[in-house]
């Protein structure tokens, strides 16, 4: 049985959660990163007997449409699947049921789900440092529990998950921009998964293409990208919702 990690991780938190979870399943796994430029996307070859861990970030209670689109290009061959929704210490709302529906429609056999925390991708003070050492231990224990269930031989039932169908309405933005510290090095343009940043003029941002994933913000060597004064407004609005430490959750069929 080969372990596949399929992650859409613009700022690194989702990938880190996936790695920690898989550390409890198997020492070695194959990672496919979906948050890359389209021409760099390399889809995995999955066999029916493999175990696939699909991890996505939560944006306002939903998962990114681009992540869904790219997962839909993966041939599942009926492989066993674990879905992981990673959120920034606010709420995951309908993300898990959306991932369940998408993965099931793609032919995966979804037998377990995890809701886990990482630093908020915009307001980094919320969930700061997560996944931390305590999360690492817990996520590894989740991985061991999942492996035990998969290898146990008992038939799987339909996984019951919290969330609503139909899903809540998604939203877009805020969109990051470059400030006066931008050196036009082009790193952001080379890393943007949608091509929203021009390589010829990295200070220009196409908001029709931008999904607000903050990939460009996380990779900028000059720390010259962000959402400006909107950060203070958003942080104040989120503070009562993100103040308390949220728990990680495991669901197994």
Task: Annotate each predicted stretch with a short phrase.
Residues 91-92, 181, 209:
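Charged, low-complexity surface patches
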Residues 2-36, 43-172, 228-253:
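FMN-binding flavodoxin-like domain, especially the glycine-rich phosphate-binding loop
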Residues 157-194:
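A mid-sequence, solvent-exposed acidic-amphipathic segment
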Residues 178, 187-205, 211, 215-232:
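Iron-sulfur cluster-binding cysteine motifs and their immediate structural context
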């Amino acid at each position: 049985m080969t372990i596949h990690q399929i992650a859409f991780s613009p700022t690194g938190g989702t990938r880190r959660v996936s790695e920690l979870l898989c550390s409890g399943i198997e020492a070695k796994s194959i990672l496919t990163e979906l948050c890359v430029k389209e021409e760099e996307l390399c889809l995995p070859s999955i066999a029916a007997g493999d175990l696939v861990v699909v991890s996505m970030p939560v944006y306002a209670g939903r998962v990114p449409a681009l992540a869904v689109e790219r997962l839909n290009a993966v041939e599942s061959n009926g492989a066993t699947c674990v879905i992981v929704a990673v959120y920034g210490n606010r709420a995951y709302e309908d993300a898990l049921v959306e991932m369940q529906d998408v993965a099931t429609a793609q032919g995966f056999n979804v037998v377990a789900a995890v809701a886990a925390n990482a630093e908020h991708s915009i307001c980094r003070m919320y969930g700061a440092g997560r996944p931390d050492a305590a999360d690492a231990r817990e996520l590894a224990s989740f991985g061991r529990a999942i492996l035990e269930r998969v290898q146990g031989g008992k038939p799987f039932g339909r996984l019951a998950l919290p969330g609503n169908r139909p899903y809540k309405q998604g939203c877009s933005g805020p969109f990051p921009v470059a400030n006066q510290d931008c050196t036009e090095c082009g790193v952001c343009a080379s890393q943007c998964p949608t091509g929203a940043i021009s390589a010829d003029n990295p200070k220009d941002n196409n908001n029709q293409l931008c999904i607000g994933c903050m990939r460009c913000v996380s990779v900028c060597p000059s720390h010259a990208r962000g959402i400006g004064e909107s950060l203070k407004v958003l942080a104040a609005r989120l503070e009562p919702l993100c103040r308390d430490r949220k728990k990680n959750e495991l669901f197994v069929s």
